[in-house]
A protein has these predicted regions:
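Compact, glycine-rich, soluble single-domain proteins
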Residues: 2, 22-164
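Membrane-entry signal-anchor segments at the cytosolic-membrane interface
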Residues: 2-14
Length: 164
C-alpha cells in the first residue's frame, strides 16, 4: 500500500514540475517585455510632428538574435530597437516571428534610411537595409503608415546617442 502512495506522490510531483516549467516558458516567451531588456521611449519626428514609441532595446548579440521571435502580440505603440556598434549592411528575417512587422532602418545620423512594411511572419526571406544602417526599429505592421513615417525622418533615442 505504501508503494502505491509513494508512486502517486511522485506522479503528483512530476505533474506539478511540468506545469511549473510550462508556465515559466510561456511567461518567458509571451509576457510583456518577455526578454527582460530595458525599455526606452523613441521619438519619431515626422512631417506631422513627433510620435512616441516604447521600445525594448536589443544591444547584445543574444538579444538581437532573439529579437521578437516567439511573441504573439505587440502593442500599437511598441517596438524593438536593434542598435549596432557601427554602420553596416544589416539583414533581418522573420524566422520564428509570429507578428507581421514594419522594419525601419536608421542611419548613423539618426535618420530613417530605408523602410520595409509588412514583413511576412515566419518567412526566412532576407530583409536588407538597402545600404549602411546603424539600427533597426521593428514595429507592428501598419505602424509606419499609421504614423506617416518616411525616409529622412529623424529618430531620437538615448541608445542611439550613446553609440560611438
Amino acid at each position: 500500500m505504501s508503494d502505491v502512495k509513494s508512486r502517486a506522490a511522485l506522479a503528483a510531483l512530476f505533474v506539478a514540475c511540468m506545469i511549473g516549467l510550462g508556465l515559466g516558458l510561456y511567461a518567458y516567451f509571451h509576457g510583456p517585455a518577455a526578454s527582460g531588456m530595458r525599455r526606452e521611449t523613441i521619438t519619431l519626428t515626422t512631417s506631422a510632428g513627433p510620435k512616441a514609441i516604447s521600445a525594448e532595446i536589443a544591444l547584445s548579440g543574444p538579444e538581437q538574435e532573439q529579437g521578437l521571435m516567439f511573441r504573439k502580440q505587440l502593442g500599437d505603440d511598441e517596438g524593438m530597437l536593434f542598435v549596432y556598434q557601427r554602420p553596416q549592411d544589416i539583414t533581418m528575417w522573420m524566422r520564428n516571428t509570429y507578428i507581421p512587422l514594419d522594419m525601419v532602418f536608421i542611419s548613423s545620423d539618426s535618420r530613417i534610411a530605408h523602410i520595409v512594411e509588412g514583413a511576412e511572419p515566419l518567412s526566412e526571406r532576407i530583409i536588407s537595409s538597402g545600404g549602411k544602417a546603424q539600427s533597426v526599429l521593428e514595429l507592428k505592421a501598419g505602424t509606419v503608415r499609421r504614423l506617416g513615417l518616411a525616409t529622412g525622418d529623424r529618430v531620437a533615442a538615448s541608445s542611439l546617442a550613446s553609440v560611438p
